[in-house]
């Protein structure tokens, strides 16, 4: 199967050891937002399929359901290769509130549908074996949330496009050293003919900025 959006989502930080997780995931609607109570995160299978990173409202996802989707679930099995490195799971964006599970254990909770986030899952995976990644995405009516990806009306009035729920940007794995660079920012000055570089490094037990 051809992987959609196969390019690295952050080419400035493309490392040799990365795996694009776009493509087919298992998927299930949770209209009553009761899946966490019913422990969907312990399931080995969900009831349908979806093509990530396209949201379930999109035809490209294979679903194309434009009704109100208060909660959706995703499941993907990933084999973690044997290596003496840390394993970082990246999400380009998940709209709006998300719970991330690895091998049926909650590892991260994120609120906000516009900015990417990452999770160090090293201590939750079994190397050399198949591991389960499960995502619960909750996205009810706006109720004070930033407008843009949702509308209180079925036909998306005051919203420039169809509602967007759940994963809508690339998901990928990265294998990194115990100490690694997380991000770099550049500040340029034409007047001073200078460039300042701000580096954020993840050390084994702390984050260093310089």
Where on the chain are the PLM-derived regions?
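N-terminal pre-domain segments of enzymes
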Residues: 1-18
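Accessory beta-strand-rich segments of carbohydrate-active enzymes
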Residues: 7-12, 26-32, 64-181, 206
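Mature N-terminal segment immediately following signal peptide/propeptide cleavage
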Residues: 16-28
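Short, solvent-exposed loop/turn elements at domain surfaces
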Residues: 28-38, 58-61
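Short Gly/aromatic-enriched secondary-structure transition segments
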Residues: 36-48
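Short flexible loop/turn segments that cap and initiate beta-strands
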Residues: 38, 137, 208-210
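Beta-strand-rich binding/interaction modules
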Residues: 102, 193-210
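Short beta-strand segments of immunoglobulin-like
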Residues: 184-190
């Amino acid at each position: 199967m051809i992987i959609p959006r196969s390019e690295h989502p952050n080419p400035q930080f493309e490392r040799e050891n990365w795996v694009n997780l776009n493509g087919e995931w298992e998927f299930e609607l949770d209209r009553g937002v009761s899946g966490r109570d019913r422990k969907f995160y312990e399931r080995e299978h969900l009831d349908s399929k979806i093509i990530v990173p396209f949201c379930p409202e999109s035809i490209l996802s294979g679903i194309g359901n434009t009704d109100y989707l208060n909660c959706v679930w995703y499941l993907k099995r990933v084999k973690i290769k044997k290596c003496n490195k840390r394993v970082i799971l990246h999400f380009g964006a998940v709209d709006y509130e998300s719970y991330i599970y690895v091998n049926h254990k909650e590892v991260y909770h994120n609120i906000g549908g516009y900015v990417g986030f990452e999770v160090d899952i090293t201590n939750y995976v079994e190397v050399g074996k198949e591991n389960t990644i499960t995502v619960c995405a909750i996205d009810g009516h706006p109720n004070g949330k930033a407008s843009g990806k949702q509308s209180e009306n079925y036909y998306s009035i005051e919203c420039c496009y169809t509602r967007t729920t759940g994963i809508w940007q690339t998901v990928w794995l990265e294998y990194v050293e115990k100490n690694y660079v997380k991000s770099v920012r550049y500040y340029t000055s034409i007047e001073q003919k200078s460039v300042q570089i701000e580096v954020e490094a993840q050390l084994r037990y702390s984050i260093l900025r310089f």
